Every structure is written in structure tokens, then in C-alpha cells.
């Protein structure tokens, strides 16, 4: 029949018209925006928490703590940062409070610290001093160093210890280990000893001004299997 087009010509026309429906560029219509990177992981997969670390992160989240997981690192022989976090605000019974000058700590240390801060410090502040806790000041955590006067690595070299120097209350008072341990009011002295004793129930090693002169200005809180409190 005159005017009829061969079937091959019609098929080619259909294919070409379908190509015009594809978006411009070299992408197909199935391309999608990559999903967001989960918190605590890297796009390259350089940071993968251990199973224990993942479980601990879930437990730490349950305390209401603000934190960010950090990449693992081996800085020197005996100096490691494994399953560590950068710890921000913590949750008290009725309000949140901040943490000052704290470096990387293991998740287990952070979780223990969060429980102590809420149940041992915030509550003691309200009972003994009549004010809620606003901030805990520290002298740091991770440090690649030995125990003073020895060749043994400190717990600080594994990010498993925190040195606490003072507590700031919502009413503006600052209760410092140095000065108030022996020189504070009766309520302040009682408060500092209560928080020390509470820490002894949670941490493996707790050192206070009663231990030696090197700890006259802070409480050393260290996780572990040991049981030493002074």
C-alpha cells in the first residue's frame, strides 16, 4: 500500500522518541541521591566501631548524653583511643549540665561518668547545697603518658580516666576540689566527699586529695577491674 512505512522504520522512531524522555546528562532515570552518612561513620569506611563499641554507644545514648563517636587511633606503644567519644552535655534528673575541658574518653568511661554525674553529683548538689548542677570542670582525659614515677602507662593513655577539678552550680557557686576539700563550708566539704564516695561505687580507681599531694586539686576517676578508693 502506497504511503505505508516499513515496520523497521516505525520501530526506530519509537526508540528515538523514548530516548527523549531521559533526563539530560549521563544519568539514568534510576539514579538517586546517596543516603546521608550515619553519625559516627565515615563515607570511606575508615571508622567502623567494634560490636562492643556499638552496644556501648546505644547504652550511652540511653542516658541522654550528647556525644560524637571518634575514629580509633594508635598514637604510640600503649597509647590508644579505641571506641572513644567526644562527650558534651549530660542529663540530670530535672535538667542538663555541661562538661568542660574534656578530651576523648572511651565509651565505657563516658557511660560510667554519665551515671555518676547524674546520680552521684547532681543529686548530691541538690541535697547538700540546695542547687542543681550546671557544669563539671575537668583537667582532661586522654594523654599519652606514664604513671608518674614509673614505666607503666597511665589509664589516661587509653582514654580510660578523667580528672575532675570543680563543680559549677546553677546558682553560680563554684565548688573546687582545690581549696574546698578542706577549706570549704561544711556543706561543700560534705558534698565533695559524697561525690568521691559515689564515684568509688562506679569506677575501678578513684584518687582524691586524701591519696597524695599530686591529687590535691582533682578527683582521678578511672574505669577498670581494680577496686581502689582513697
Walk through the language-model features, giving the residues of each.
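A eukaryotic "domain-start" boundary segment
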Residues: 20-22
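C-terminal motif of bacterial Sec signal peptides marking the signal peptidase cleavage site
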Residues: 15-18
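Bacterial N-terminal signal peptides that target proteins for export
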Residues: 1-9
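Catalytic cores and adjacent binding grooves of peptidoglycan-active enzymes
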Residues: 24-25, 30-32, 82, 86-88, ...
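Active-site-adjacent substructure of cysteine-protease-like catalytic cores
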Residues: 127-159
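Active-site acidic/histidine clusters and adjacent loop/turn architecture
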Residues: 48-136
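Second-shell loop/turn segments in exported
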Residues: 41-47, 103-112, 150-151, 177-186
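Post-signal peptide N-terminal segment of mature Sec-exported envelope proteins
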Residues: 27-55
Amino acid at each position: 500500500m502506497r504511503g505505508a512505512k516499513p515496520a523497521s522504520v516505525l520501530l526506530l522512531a519509537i526508540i528515538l522518541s523514548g530516548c527523549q524522555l531521559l533526563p539530560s546528562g549521563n544519568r539514568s532515570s534510576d539514579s538517586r541521591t546517596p543516603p546521608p552518612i550515619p553519625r559516627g561513620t565515615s563515607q570511606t569506611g575508615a571508622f567502623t566501631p567494634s560490636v562492643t563499641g556499638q552496644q556501648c554507644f546505644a547504652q550511652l545514648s540511653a542516658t541522654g548524653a550528647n556525644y560524637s563517636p571518634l575514629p580509633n587511633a594508635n598514637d604510640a606503644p600503649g597509647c590508644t583511643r579505641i571506641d572513644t567519644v567526644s562527650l558534651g552535655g549530660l542529663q540530670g534528673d530535672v535538667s542538663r549540665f555541661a562538661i568542660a575541658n574534656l578530651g576523648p574518653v572511651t565509651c565505657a568511661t563516658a557511660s560510667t561518668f554519665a551515671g555518676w554525674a547524674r546520680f552521684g553529683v547532681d543529686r548530691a548538689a541538690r541535697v547538700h547545697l540546695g542547687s542543681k548542677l550546671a557544669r563539671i570542670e575537668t583537667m582532661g582525659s586522654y594523654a599519652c603518658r606514664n604513671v608518674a614515677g614509673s614505666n607503666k602507662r597511665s589509664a589516661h593513655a587509653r582514654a580510660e580516666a578523667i580528672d575532675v577539678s570543680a563543680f559549677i552550680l546553677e546558682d553560680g557557686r563554684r565548688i573546687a576540689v582545690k581549696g574546698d576539700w578542706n577549706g570549704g563550708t561544711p556543706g561543700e566539704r560534705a558534698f565533695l566527699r559524697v561525690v568521691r564516695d559515689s564515684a568509688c561505687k562506679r569506677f575501678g580507681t578513684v584518687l582524691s586529695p586524701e591519696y597524695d599531694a599530686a591529687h590535691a586539686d582533682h578527683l582521678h576517676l578511672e574505669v577498670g577491674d581494680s577496686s581502689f578508693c582513697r
